[in-house]
Regions:
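Flexible, polar/low-complexity N-terminal or interdomain linker segments that lie immediately upstream
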Residues: 1-23, 99-105
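Rhodanese-like catalytic fold shared by cysteine-dependent sulfurtransferases
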Residues: 22-56, 60-105
Length: 105
């Protein structure tokens, strides 16, 4: 995940609620909140190719929001969706790279 963030070529989406995203998120990620409307989700996906790899994450491995957003993406034709299971909690705990650890949007 650290490499993906540093390369900044793969879209990374935070599936948590907007208030959690605003509190802090993985550097370079955008919100694709579980509570957002279909229209809001489609707006966030503009310009992303259907075959481009997309990473989705949630709070932790016990959070199902990333699974629901991944299903939404697949249903809408995005074929290369992966879930970062450790989520924000793992990223923040490990602070993989202080320069790219956690940012506020």
């Amino acid at each position: 995940m650290q490499k993906i963030v540093i390369e900044n070529k793969t879209p990374i989406f935070d599936a948590r609620h907007l208030r959690d995203y605003e509190y802090g998120t993985i550097s370079g990620s955008k919100t694709l909140s579980i509570s957002s409307s279909i229209e809001e989700r489609q707006k966030q996906l503009l310009g992303i190719g259907k075959e481009q790899r997309i990473v989705v994450f949630c709070q932790s491995s016990g959070c199902g929001y990333s699974d629901e957003i991944a299903q939404f993406l697949k249903f809408n034709g995005y074929s290369n969706v992966v879930i970062y299971r450790g989520g924000y909690r793992e990223w923040e705990k490990n602070r993989f790279d202080e320069k790219h650890a956690v940012t506020k949007p």
